[in-house]
From Swiss-Prot:
Secretion signal span: none
Protein function: Allows the formation of correctly charged Gln-tRNA(Gln) through the transamidation of misacylated Glu-tRNA(Gln) in organisms which lack glutaminyl-tRNA synthetase. The reaction takes place in the presence of glutamine and ATP through an activated gamma-phospho-Glu-tRNA(Gln). The GatDE system is specific for glutamate and does not act on aspartate.
Gene3D superfamilies reported for this sequence: 2.30.30.520, 3.40.50.40, L-asparaginase, N-terminal domain
PANTHER family for this protein: 60 KDA LYSOPHOSPHOLIPASE, L-ASPARAGINASE
UniProt domain Asparaginase/glutaminase: residue ranges: 99-432
Keywords annotated in UniProt: ATP-binding, Ligase, Nucleotide-binding, Protein biosynthesis
Group of enzyme by EC: ligase
Biological-process GO terms, alphabetical: amino acid metabolic process; regulation of translational fidelity; translation
Assembly and oligomerization: Heterodimer of GatD and GatE.
GO molecular function, one term: glutaminyl-tRNA synthase (glutamine-hydrolyzing) activity
Annotated catalysed reactions: L-glutamyl-tRNA(Gln) + L-glutamine + ATP + H2O = L-glutaminyl-tRNA(Gln) + L-glutamate + ADP + phosphate + H(+)
Protein name: Glutamyl-tRNA(Gln) amidotransferase subunit D
Length: 451
């Protein structure tokens, strides 16, 4: 049982017969007494720290130096991790609400849970498991589900976007009564995938709703259940058929905000309300307790009868952030490696060092499409104000307007998957295909008054 722990910790735990997942009581030098499940130690960290799962769901680390005694309270009784449909309550008659929603699992915190009886981490994504974990879904929709991937979101590639778009198209064509598709996804690159579906799935009978979780389902502060409820409400009730993200709108469990995939960005590493609409407002707001949806706009792509999917993406596109002292060799590298498109995150209104302009000009001359977005995130590129911007335009750089850099990257990847014609590439990139570009910037689209 000592895997990951030091010999001193092993000696202490072995002396009382304690093993992983046994219930133990630990008395500390300051008189504090803690009870919980003895957990394996993470791969990284101090081997002299004992990890305990408290009854409130949180894990804590206890330094060996603070421990006075360990008492074994209850031995772990091993059992196999439940297979889909075997969990308690999974055979319950959930009733047959009229709407039907299809869940697609791709991995991430939202689509897995920890079984602390076995210690195993495994996907929960059958309809029965979703109902068991989130009973409120029973009154909202009939759930069908399928796991397409089980990967970390940072491992997503344009090839995965292609497979996901094809799967969503297949679901809408095959399941004529499905009101919407909910995609469970890791949060770190969720906005990339949501933007990709906005371009690839061009017509659909219902929305594609991306949902994730900042906190795992075994934590008391988990946002998973409420986010899934909100996403389901959107899939059932939204009048639009767009690719959107449904996540917490505040740190409280009161509101789910619905962001267009092409306008959303993860703006915090860990807050439950990490996602924000950039240069735009959320398209809708959900009250997850009432199961109601309130639209914030009258302009959207409505539900239709057809399913149109153009799923090809190019993997020869890069997103490059400019920084002071950046070497021209970086652009030369992409040219040598055969890249067909480059989105530069420039400073301010869309600038890079004048020392880079010749390299950029060479990229364009060799047939590489080069676009400019701003690393400011909010606001829009305007390369006609300063000489550097004007020189970049003369070199052939195409401004990305007020597109988020990540969206510009995804859009260019999708465009280069459709055509190699330079004029068509530029026409598509500068066109507003999925509400990713605004004609003008609105004053209240910047959250400067949040403090």
């Amino acid at each position: 049982m000592s895997q990951g722990y030091s010999e001193k910790v092993k000696e202490l735990l072995d002396s009382v017969g304690a093993a992983f997942f046994d219930r133990v009581k630990i008395k500390l030098a300051d008189g504090l007494v803690l009870e919980g499940l003895l957990m394996p130690r993470p791969a990284f960290g101090d081997p002299d720290v004992v990890v305990l799962k408290l009854d409130n769901g949180y894990n804590i680390g206890i330094s060996l130096q603070r421990i006075v005694s360990v008492e074994l309270l209850e031995k772990f009784s091993p059992r196999e991790a439940p297979t889909p449909g075997e969990e308690e309550g999974s055979q319950e008659d959930f009733g047959q609400p009229e709407p039907r929603v299809f869940f697609v699992g791709t991995g991430g915190t939202i689509a897995s849970r920890v079984d602390y009886v076995t210690g195993a981490v495994y996907p929960y994504f059958t309809a029965e498991e979703l109902y068991s974990m989130i009973p409120e879904l029973k009154r909202l929709a009939r759930i069908s589900s399928e796991t397409l991937f089980s990967i970390f979101s940072e491992d997503m590639t344009p090839s995965h976007w292609q497979q996901l778009a094809s799967k969503i198209g297949e679901i809408f064509r095959r399941e004529s009564d499905v009101k919407g598709v909910v995609v469970a996804h890791g949060t770190d690159t969720l906005h990339y995938s949501a933007a990709a579906m906005a371009f690839a799935v061009q017509e659909a009978p219902g929305p594609i709703v991306f949902v994730g979780a900042q906190r795992s389902s075994d934590r008391p502060s988990s946002d998973a259940a409420l986010n899934v409820i909100g996403a389901t409400v959107v899939a059932v009730h939204a009048p639009f058929a767009e690719s959107v993200i449904a996540m917490h709108g505040s740190v409280n469990d009161d509101t789910i905000l619905v962001h267009r995939g092409v306008r959303a960005r993860k703006m915090h590493t860990s807050r439950r309300d990490a996602f924000m609409s950039i240069n735009s407002k959320p398209i809708a707001e959900v009250d997850p307790l009432r199961g109601s949806l309130k639209l914030s706009t009258s302009t959207y792509k409505g539900r239709g009868d057809d399913v149109v999917v153009q799923a090809s993406f190019s993997d020869k596109v890069a997103l490059v952030k400019f920084y002071p002292g950046m070497s021209p060799d970086i652009f030369d590298f992409y040219l040598e490696k055969g890249f067909k498109g480059l989105v530069i995150e420039g400073t301010g209104l869309g600038h890079v060092s004048t020392a880079l302009i010749d390299s950029v000009r060479r990229l364009v001359r060799e047939g590489v499409f080069v676009a400019m977005a701003s690393q400011c995130i909010f606001g829009r590129v305007n390369m006609n104000v300063y000489r550097t911007g004007v020189e970049l335009i003369k070199a052939g750089v195409v401004p990305a307007g007020d597109m988020i850099p990540e969206t510009a990257y995804v859009k260019l990847s999708w465009i280069l998957g459709q055509t190699e014609d330079p004029e068509e590439i530029q026409r598509l990139f500068t066109a507003n295909l999925a509400f990713e570009i605004s004609e003008r910037s609105e004053f209240d689209h910047y959250p400067g008054a949040r403090w």
